[in-house]
Amino acid sequence: MRPLTEEETRVMFEKIAKYIGENLQLLVDRPDGTYCFRLHNDRVYYVSEKIMKLAANISGDKLVSLGTCFGKFTKTHKFRLHVTALDYLAPYAKYKVWIKPGAEQSFLYGNHVLKSGLGRITENTSQYQGVVVYSMADIPLGFGVAAKSTQDCRKVDPMAIVVFHQADIGEYVRHEETLT
């Protein structure tokens, strides 16, 4: 377990900023304590400093995880967000997409969101912008990347993809043995 290097921090913060923008500061400076990001086995964990100090007594090879896994670095040093970060990203999301009940199951199985399943989309969402996907009952289901801008979504055909799938809460079941 070690702090992130400057390059790792920059790559991770750029990825998170695609979803929550300048609200990134609210993740680190919280009123209930100081939180930080730590790297362990190529995975980035979001952990309170109090728990981090307790975990310092455990050897690195025995430590499985600590805090909440936000994502991992790939072998090419790109950062991939995990669905476990959804609970922390959803309240601060700038751009949101709501999908119809009929499209929820398709999204939770790992498929992209089609125009026919789109309920609402935040105004001024640009193309390739990170979005948090909600059900019509305002339950966060996952996150993705907008394939079309808000204006383009109005005039595309119903079978066009409007949100590229990145992660969803169905991964808890599909990848339960590898999710830490």
UniProtKB/Swiss-Prot annotation:
Record keywords, A-Z: Nucleus, Ribosome biogenesis, RNA-binding
Region (N-terminal domain): 1-92
This protein's record includes keyword Signal: no
Positions of the PUA domain: 94-170
Primary subcellular site in the record, as a coarse category: nucleus
Known outcome of mutating E171Q: In a breast cancer sample; somatic mutation
CDD domains the UniProt entry points to: Nip7_N_euk, PUA_Nip7-like
SUPFAM superfamilies, alphabetized: Pre-PUA domain, PUA domain-like
Subcellular location: Nucleus, Nucleolus
Tissue: Expressed in hematopoietic stem/progenitor cells.
A GO term for molecular function: RNA binding
A family per Pfam: pre-PUA_NIP7
One Gene Ontology cellular component: nucleolus
Positions of region (C-terminal domain): 93-180
Gene Ontology terms describing biological process: ribosomal large subunit biogenesis; ribosome assembly
Function recorded in the entry: Required for proper 34S pre-rRNA processing and 60S ribosome subunit assembly.
PANTHER family, sorted: CYCLIN-DEPENDENT KINASES REGULATORY SUBUNIT/60S RIBOSOME SUBUNIT BIOGENESIS PROTEIN NIP7
Assembly behavior: Monomer. Interacts with pre-ribosome complex. May bind to RNA. Interacts with NOL8. May interact with SBDS. Interacts with FTSJ3. Interacts with DDX24.
Entry similarity comment: Belongs to the NIP7 family.
Protein name: 60S ribosome subunit biogenesis protein NIP7 homolog
Lineage: Eukaryota, Metazoa, Chordata, Craniata, Vertebrata
